Amino acid sequence: MAKTQSPLQWLATTIIRGYQLLISPMMGPRCRFNPTCSHYAIEAIRLHGVVKGCWFAGKRILRCHPLHPGGEDPVPNKKHRCDK
């Protein structure tokens, strides 16, 4: 069963999706990570919510530059309060 998105999650993922469809194709492939930063942002927002997801996405985007080696960098799993 699919989890429903909050209106803020929907808005954030729609903006990122718009970037993927309209802006990213004109710039060409530049991201050195897998998944790409925009896919990472959508996944982080869906998994962790808007605030924490945007925090993870912002940290990831700051690492996406020519001096960073890149590579595999999946979204961290959601930790529950009982996990330490």
Swiss-Prot record:
Recorded coiled-coil stretches: none
Record localization: Cell inner membrane
Cellular component terms per the entry's GO annotation: plasma membrane
Membrane topology summary: Peripheral membrane protein
InterPro entries: Membr_insert_effic_factor_YidD
Keywords for this protein: Cell inner membrane, Cell membrane, Membrane
Presence of the UniProt keyword Membrane in the record: yes
Organism superkingdom: Bacteria
Name of one Pfam family that matches: YidD
Family: Belongs to the UPF0161 family.
Cited function: Could be involved in insertion of integral membrane proteins into the membrane.
PANTHER family, alphabetized: MEMBRANE PROTEIN INSERTION EFFICIENCY FACTOR-RELATED
Record protein name field: Putative membrane protein insertion efficiency factor
